[in-house]
Amino acid sequence: MTIHIYNTLTRQKEEFVPLEENKVKMYVCGPTVYNYIHIGNARPPMVFDTVRRYLEYKGYDVQYVSNFTDVDDKLIKAANELGEDVPTIADRFVEAYFEDVTALGCKHATVHPRVTENMDIIIEFIQELVNKGYAYESEGDVYFKTKEFEGYGKLSHQPIADLRHGARIEVGEKKQDPLDFALWKAAKEGEIFWESPWGQGRPGWHIECSAMARKYLGDTIDIHAGGQDLAFPHHENEIAQSEALTGKTFARYWMHNGYININNEKMSKSLGNFILVHDIIKQYDPQLIRFFMLSVHYRHPINFSEELLQSTNNGLERIKTAYGNLKHRMESSTDLTDHNEKWLVEIEKFQTAFEEAMNDDFNTANAITELYNVANYANQYLLEEHTSKVVIEAYVKQLETLFDILGLELTQEELLDEEIEELIQKRIEARKNRDFALSDQIRDDLKGRNIILEDTAQGTRWKRG
């Protein structure tokens, strides 16, 4: 089965064929570290960490690079407001970023380059563009000359005339064309700066990723990814800079994830409806946040609400409970061989369906449907009077493998005594109402979490297994 990726550049799904056999070069635009990340910022790390995990599962050696922009207008503004220097603020929020995304199940990239640690290669990149006639200096600033790059607009699929019509020259800018963008910005009084051939200053945003991608991954990379909002102008400008310099294709597959809405309204800081990751992971299990995010195809928008989160939690707990029940049954299962084939064939079908979903542009939504199917069939198998260790182990291994691909864990938080008593009372009410299906479900769910019930004449007793 081959992997197909929706390529923003061509607007169609294409078979994934890396430049080098069994190796993938992948660059994901990272955050500007001037504040804590919100859940919209967290979607790309979770999505593309999952892409990376699946590629590794399929046997690829993935070189995964994700940068930190640690000098920028927003950082300078934050430094001025807080009375701190830029490096101090950047260091603080790099650490906070790692805490947040690690909690959300994301592995560290192969390399996390920082702009301030790569200033020499950024300046060198700009100088080469100037030498080739693709950039020009203007009163200490350096701009990219967009009219010199023939393919400008090919990622956003907009004619250059339309792009120019919507562009403007800001006050203080000395550029030749409204579409030209800054590669180097002359330092203003009191700002952090670096020495360069054009005087003291700092790099523009777009050039940073081009230079660092080239340093760590080479002239051409396999996958370049980020949020949908980065397609234009950031990624468009990256293509222009990189391909103008090297004359080679910069990235072969462009992937962009969709936006996040809060209660059906687009999330934005201006509306004040954003949710910080470090706040929400105190309220909800970070694994639930990740599972929720992956329950929607990465290119589609997500509507984030507490009601939807709770509904998703019910589904996640159902899978975890099935896993717990399987583990609990392991000890009492035997070496039966009768009827194993029927169940093992079904398990293989689920594996195939899961991989087909992931091969289809990393469709985690459909892949998660297969997790529910595995859990449902496992529960059916557990109703058998006698169960086989071979089948139980196959179900357990499958759930563990599929969860690992999605960056998820199967552990459940231990129930508090009062939570157990509450569930027992709910079960008693269900039995009074002759709702035996609910009664059995509660009993089985508790058993899956190592809580054993014993019905006696004096009432229901329980113990931890």
From Swiss-Prot:
Q: Gene name, please?
A: cysS
Q: Which residues bind ATP?
A: K269
**UniProt-recorded name of the protein:** Cysteine--tRNA ligase
The scientific name of the source species is: Bacillus cereus (strain G9842)
Record's family? Belongs to the class-I aminoacyl-tRNA synthetase family.
Give the EC class as a word: ligase
Cite the cofactor comment: Binds 1 zinc ion per subunit.
Keyword vocabulary terms for this entry: Aminoacyl-tRNA synthetase, ATP-binding, Cytoplasm, Ligase, Metal-binding, Nucleotide-binding, Phosphoprotein, Protein biosynthesis, Zinc
Q: Which GO terms describe its molecular function?
A: ATP binding; cysteine-tRNA ligase activity; zinc ion binding
Q: Kindly state the subunit structure of this protein.
A: Monomer.
Q: What is its EC number?
A: 6.1.1.16
